[in-house]
């Protein structure tokens, strides 16, 4: 197992591409599992088979990378994907997630994303949601989907 923590952060595009090719090659050559820790969704798209999206130390969504990136279920995953700049939106304002991340030493009683979530309901700030299996096969931690999703895992 290779743990790669932000392997391309701060590198120019050519060096990033070289690192990604090296990781792919070693994955294939050695039948190596890679745990990739990154905020770069382009790197996730290039390398990951499965993805876990975390916020404030908790898993918010987990599933096949293609599924999570093309059909995100959790409001944080959706916001994270929307915050990635695209050339097709040139000249438009960049999307930003409102508010500030929580203080990890003083986490709220409920969902730690609820203060920043555009679709939060009162239950979100009151209790931490369970992780549920969605119809897409992803696991999602969100009260808004609990009634439409099978029982908690």
Give the role of each language-model region:
Residues 3-7, 11-92:
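P-loop NTP-binding/switch modules centered on Walker-like glycine-rich loops
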């Amino acid at each position: 197992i290779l743990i790669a923590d932000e392997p391309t952060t701060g590198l120019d595009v050519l060096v990033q591409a070289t690192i990604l090719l090296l990781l792919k090659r070693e994955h294939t050559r050695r039948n190596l599992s890679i745990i990739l820790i990154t905020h770069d969704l382009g790197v996730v798209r290039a390398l990951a088979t499965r993805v876990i999206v975390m916020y404030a130390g908790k898993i918010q969504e987990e599933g096949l990378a293609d599924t999570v990136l093309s059909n995100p279920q959790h409001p944080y995953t959706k916001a994270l994907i929307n915050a990635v700049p695209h050339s097709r939106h040139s000249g438009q304002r960049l999307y930003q997630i409102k508010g500030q991340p929580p203080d990890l030493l003083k986490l709220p009683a409920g969902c730690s994303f609820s203060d920043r979530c555009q679709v939060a309901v009162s239950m979100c700030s009151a209790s931490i949601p369970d992780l549920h299996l969605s119809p897409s096969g992803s696991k999602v931690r969100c009260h808004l989907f609990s009634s439409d999703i099978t029982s908690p895992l």
